Amino acid sequence: MTSLRKLERDFAHADAAAVAGLLAQLGDEDIMARFGLEARLADLQQEIARLDAAGDEPTASAALFFGGRPVLGQRGIESEFAGTVITKFQDIVAKVLARETNGLGQRGVVANKAASTLHITNIVRGSFGFLLEEAGLQQHMVETPLRAAVDEATRLLDAFGEPDEEQFRTAIETIDDRLLATARDFFDIMRSNGATLRLVSGGTDRSFGTEAVERAAERATSTTVQDSEEVLRGQLGGVLPD
């Protein structure tokens, strides 16, 4: 299920629960109000069933909800903080995509960065959040490389906040220096601004409270990457001409 569909389903469930609560408070004399609320509840239940039955979208999407010091409830968010932290998330996605496709060099321009571009397509309720989606006119039948990269970036960030140390170490076994450095920047921005985060992408729905942000920032700072040489033995079968 995409981030948008999951959020729509969550909101529909919340609205249905609120309507059911109002119905429970009505007396027998509130006939017209009951008719209206029952019709609204039926519509919400149909919407939930539609969202549950919908297939998974092959394109990338992620929703980032922020709370804490930079946020004024659902009214607004500090623009400098929002721009900086969203840019860092985009950088993580770009580096994951490069690593999984053309390879991520130790320095220099990130390969195929344009292909990793996400667009802010909506402001979503629930504290203050942004919906980021893969844009394009082409229809896709199978999962796009960017969808896989966004899901992997989300899994990686999730690992830094994971309470279990062993699960964290297992999840970051293949991380490289450039990706680690960008994750470090991301969580440093979160911590220094006193921000919290809920990150929704694919099947992941992860909340980073103050404690989780602190843990993630400390791990990103203290973790180091150690390279090792590996010898692979084989036989050259031939060389293709240029």
Regions inferred by a protein language model and the residue ranges of each:
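Protein-protein interaction interfaces in oligomeric scaffolds
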Residues: 1-209
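Structural detector for short beta-strands of small beta-barrel domains
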Residues: 226-241
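A short, compositionally biased
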Residues: 192-194, 239-242
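Short boundary/loop segments of OB/S1/cold-shock single-stranded nucleic-acid-binding domains
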Residues: 208-229
